[in-house]
Each structure stands twice: as C-alpha cells, then as structure tokens.
Amino acid sequence: MGLPWYRVHTVVLNDPGRLLSVHIMHTALVAGWAGSMALYELAVFDPSDPVLDPMWRQGMFVIPFMTRLGITNSWGGWNITGGTITNPGLWSYEGVAGAHIVFSGLCFLAAIWHWVYWDLEIFCDERTGKPSLDLPKIFGIHLFLSGVACFGFGAFHVTGLYGPGIWVSDPYGLTGKVQPVNPAWGVEGFDPFVPGGIASHHIAAGTLGILAGLFHLSVRPPQRLYKGLRMGNIETVLSSSIAAVFFAAFVVAGTMWYGSATTPIELFGPTRYEWDQGYFQQEIYRRVSAGLAENQSLSEVWSKIPEKLAFYDYIGNNPAKGGLFRAGSMDNGDGIAVGWLGHPVFRNKEGRELFVRRMPTFFETFPVVLVDGDGIVRAYVPFRRAESKYSVEQVGVTVELYGGELNGVSYSDPATVKKYARRAQLGEIFELDRATLKSDGVFRSSPRGWFTFGHASFALLFFFGHIWHGARTLFRDVFAGIDPDLDAQVEFGAFQKLGDPTTKRQAA
C-alpha cells in the first residue's frame, strides 16, 4: 500500500473487526506494562524504613497507585507500613501485578483472534451487507458499562461494602492506612482533600453514566444532529475520545501537583506548596508551643516531634527542587535519609533566639541570614567579611540541637555554627547516606513531579490531536474538495479538478 508512517492507521478505518483488534492489543500493552513495571519496582523496593525511605523517596511509580486502592501486603512477607505478615492473600502487590500480566496475555490472544477473524456478521449492516458500526448505540453501551464500573467502585470498593476501602490519612500524612470511607453528600464532598467526596462523586457520576447510557441506547439522535456532528464517522469517535482523555489528564495533573485526597503525601510525597507555605514547619512549631505551655523543656517537646513530620519539613522532599530531566529517584540525589539529627536553635551572645531564613523553592543558592522573632536581621554568613557587621563571629552565635540524634548537643565555634546554619536553610537537618547509591548530591523530583509533567505534556499534545481530528471529521468534504451541494453525477478521474468540466483530462 505504501502508506507513510503517519497514515498507517487508515488500514482500520473501514474495518470494524481489525479496529477492535488493535484496541484490544493496545489494552494488552498497557496492562502488560503495568504488571511488568510493578514486578520491577517490587524487585528493587526496600520496605524496611517506611518513615525515612518511603516509596516516593525510592522513585516508585506504580506501587503508590496500588496502595491507594487498598493493596498493602506483599508475598515477600512485608507490609507497606513496616510490619510483617504471614498470609498476604491473592490481592497482594505481586497478585495484582500477576493479574495484569495474565490479563495482558489474554488480550494479546484475543487481539490476534480478532485480526484473523475480522469479517464477522455482527459488523455487517443487514441492509447493505457492508461492514458498518452503529456508533451512537456503541456509545450508549460504553457509557452504560463505564457508569456501572464507576458506581460499583464508589458504592462498594471505596465504602468497604465489598472491598478494602482506600488509603486515608490525616492532614500531615502521619497516620495513613487503608480504611472504608463513607460518602460525603454535603458541601464538604466538594473539598478535594475530603476522602468522602471520592465515594459520593463516583456514586453520583456512575448513576448519571448509567442513566445517560440507557438514554443513548433507547433514543436515536435526530438526523440533523447526526449529520451535523458527523456521528457516522469513526474519526468523530476518535476526536471526542481524545477530548475525554486530555481533559482527564489535565485534571489529574492538577490534583497530583496541588495535592488532593486522591494523592496522599505518604504515597506520592509532599507538594511544593507545603514547603512554600511552611505547612509542616507551622505544625511542628504549634506542637512545640503547646508542649512549652505545659511547662515541658525544649528537649522534651522536640523529642516528641514525630520523625516522619520532621522529614516532610525538608527541602529535599520538595518535588519542585529536582530538575525535570534529572534521572533517578530522590535517594539518588541527596542520598538515603538515615536519621534526624535534631532541630537547631540559634542564639546570639545576648541570648536572643535567631531563625535561619529558609531557601525558596527555585533557588539553588541562598544567603545564610539569621533573623530574630520580629524579622530583624541579627546575623549572617557574609560574602565579604571585611565589610560585615553581623557575621557569626562578631555576633557570637551559638547553636543547640533538640530532638533527634544530637538532642542537647550545643556548639559555639563559628565554623560548626555556620555549618548548621547552612543546613537549616534546607529545613530540618537529617543525616543522609550518599555512599550506598553513589548519590550525587543534586536534588531529584518525586513521582509526583514526574506524573504531573508527563500528564500535562500529553494532555497538551492530545488537545491538539482533538482539534486536528475534530477539524478533519467536521470539514471532511471541504478537505476532500467535494462541493456538498453538488447533485450532478461526477465521474472520478475524468477531470483534473473534481466536478469542474473545464478541466477535462486529455486522452493520451
């Protein structure tokens, strides 16, 4: 046939059997990739430290999606929260991966069968005997079935009526676990951070899909609408399907990047806005203030801060710090976190407490500036020592660490104080192992960043695909050069320009 590479899909344009075949093969490839990727991730995943080396630090991409739907156990005898188990059951991580691979194989065989046996009676129009698809009817069937699946997921899986529920956590990502969720039917259901909205929206959308599917199965489209929207053309289906996909991709790119109940920070890592707004820092200080109000010592209150909460408050976990094209997991960047060294408290020689200004997200370097409680600069690490007035040496800054491994340790020598001041720019201070993975010290993004970038990019690409194919199907007659009002019988090939008798071809 000699088709160029960008026109090869025309071979299934008027061949319903093989159109079905290539879609089944596509499903086989997607399911096969998902299962294979899951097995690969399980082979390299280290579940030993869910607090300081969680899945998102290790660059896991499909494990978080399985976990948020209720999978927590492995045939390896471990649980995602750090415990050990004896009977993981069929629906473990490996079980889900295996199910995808088996399903992929079955789809592969089905695709081959439909490619070989393409000329089925079901695809033939009884009136003409030619291959034909009743596209509005097929649309109704698909809408009905997807509505049933959507309703079933919300009413049974999420609510725990017949299923495990979904991953639910507190606002600071400390207590996450899989549990049933009750639908939220009030205005709170529209809050993207309320898990109950996931159940109620799936139930509502599923009900709407079922009703709309039944409508399209029982009511034929008006002739003018059918012709106006080119409902008989398979490229119309392609265009509208691409629209649905790019819209969904834009939505999930947003819920992933800005955060929502569907993208818990325990599974995908914190968002950049939690660093920008000092979200975890404020919660830590709130807990410390509450402890001090109860007459506890600084050492006691900081020792009660969960290591998990302190670890979120570290710039290396900010997905916007890693470049989009830096390959590898976060652990390959700044290293594997080993332990929290403690929270540094700086004071000048008058005993006034000083706070290090934190590095904004999009800075690679930032001046080390220490301010007091009123925001007045009291000390810094100068660029030119000869002109400095508030250097660490001149002001006599000391540092004491609370909580963590260095609880109660203090330093007064300027070199050590400046070292901890530089590290305090990056949030809470952690010991990081760079040797094990030969980490290069350059920050990486988390799967949250990869997912967002990938889906936003493909959504933009698919948006143009929707415009392209929509224009092709709506203006097909214009692009073909045929006047839609032409009622004369035209012999194809008789004229250089179709239907123009002044351009009659000369006989050779």
From Swiss-Prot:
Sequence intervals crossing the membrane: 21-36, 101-115, 140-156, 203-218, 237-252, 457-472
Cell compartments where the protein resides: Plastid, Chloroplast thylakoid membrane
Bilayer topology annotation: Multi-pass membrane protein
A GO CC term assigned to this protein in UniProt: chloroplast thylakoid membrane
GO BP, sorted A to Z: photosynthetic electron transport in photosystem II
One GO MF term attached to the UniProt entry: chlorophyll binding
A Pfam family annotated for this UniProt entry: PSII
Details of cofactor binding: Binds multiple chlorophylls. PSII binds additional chlorophylls, carotenoids and specific lipids.
Record's keyword terms, sorted: Chlorophyll, Chloroplast, Chromophore, Membrane, Photosynthesis, Photosystem II, Plastid, Thylakoid, Transmembrane, Transmembrane helix
Family: Belongs to the PsbB/PsbC family. PsbB subfamily.
Job of this protein: One of the components of the core complex of photosystem II (PSII). It binds chlorophyll and helps catalyze the primary light-induced photochemical processes of PSII. PSII is a light-driven water:plastoquinone oxidoreductase, using light energy to abstract electrons from H(2)O, generating O(2) and a proton gradient subsequently used for ATP formation.
Quaternary data: PSII is composed of 1 copy each of membrane proteins PsbA, PsbB, PsbC, PsbD, PsbE, PsbF, PsbH, PsbI, PsbJ, PsbK, PsbL, PsbM, PsbT, PsbX, PsbY, PsbZ, Psb30/Ycf12, at least 3 peripheral proteins of the oxygen-evolving complex and a large number of cofactors. It forms dimeric complexes.
UniProt name for this protein: Photosystem II CP47 reaction center protein
Organism: Aethionema grandiflorum (Persian stone-cress)
